[in-house]
Regions:
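Non-catalytic C-terminal accessory region of glycerolipid acyltransferases
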Residues: 11-153
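Membrane-interfacial amphipathic helices and adjacent loop/beta segments
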Residues: 1-12
Length: 153
């Protein structure tokens, strides 16, 4: 489902988004709203938004934590850091995302999928922000669950 990152969301797209949430098809969403950033030398997500929880509650859908292994170029992370240092709000590093995608050609990455979490179980973790942090920790924990990728010879 397309998401407009630079303005208001078209009402037809917003309606389509809501319709998909009440359907049966799994939906993969990136709750941070942006690609991960290099913070303190570690590639990690920015704080997660809570909209995925609101939609899950409204539709009574389970949440399945997912960790997508991967890394963008050092150039991308440097541009993102420079933009923040300069105080620019416009996400200029997004201009390089197509190039980043095509530079991944031929590379493999792994996707780790966790156990479903019923929304009724999430309420014990506090408010929506605390619940989002709980799901985020579950997703990041998945990276440590599997053996490292075998080295190529």
């Amino acid at each position: 489902i397309p998401v407009n990152k630079h303005g208001s969301q078209n009402s037809a797209y917003a309606r389509k988004f809501d319709e998909e949430f009440v359907g049966e098809v799994p939906i993969l969403t990136f709750p941070a709203g942006l690609c991960s950033r290099c913070i303190g030398g570690e590639v990690t997500d920015l704080p997660w938004k809570t909209n995925f929880l609101k939609k899950a509650y409204a539709s009574q859908r389970e949440i399945v934590p997912v960790f997508v292994e991967g890394r963008l170029s050092n150039f991308f992370y440097r541009v993102a850091r420079l933009r923040v240092m300069l105080g620019l709000k416009l996400n200029i590093e997004m201009l390089w995302l197509p190039d980043e995608m095509f530079s991944q050609k031929g590379r493999h990455f792994r996707i780790f999928v966790g156990d479903p979490i019923p929304v009724s179980e999430l309420q014990r973790y506090g408010g929506l922000r605390e619940q989002a942090e709980f799901v985020r920790k579950k997703a990041y924990f998945l990276e440590n669950m599997l053996a490292p990728e075998p080295e190529k010879r």
